[in-house]
């Protein structure tokens, strides 16, 4: 309760930087993201129950990533210390987004072999993204969803540390990587 209250006070104090009223603008992206997760989860549940070939799982990841890119969630520019591409071509943007989603999904999945590693990294990533979303004035739905993910992972971590009592499985680790 105390942590929830502190979080709520922080969000309320930063309300002038958070975009509260743009949910209408993001509904297509949100539905695309949720449908992409649904597709990946379907493939991974089958993999958790009955092992499927890696190419089949990769196909599911590609389908999910394509759905996300088609919904409008894209890497539209790259700004790094030595690379500054504020706008990239639309086809390059779509391909880069699909590749990024599949690569990160598989990276988190591969890290799931050690107790608490993928969950711990996902918590750090989620908290970092939450701070970035708040500072950049992202839509409130983005802040709420990433905070919910971080909170769920913080609650899960004690059960996933050595000796682990609960595991993510392919469905959980692919969900974290995809998210």
Indicate residue ranges for each PLM-predicted region:
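"…together with the soluble PPM/PP2C metallo-phosphatase catalytic core" -> "…together
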Residues: 1-179
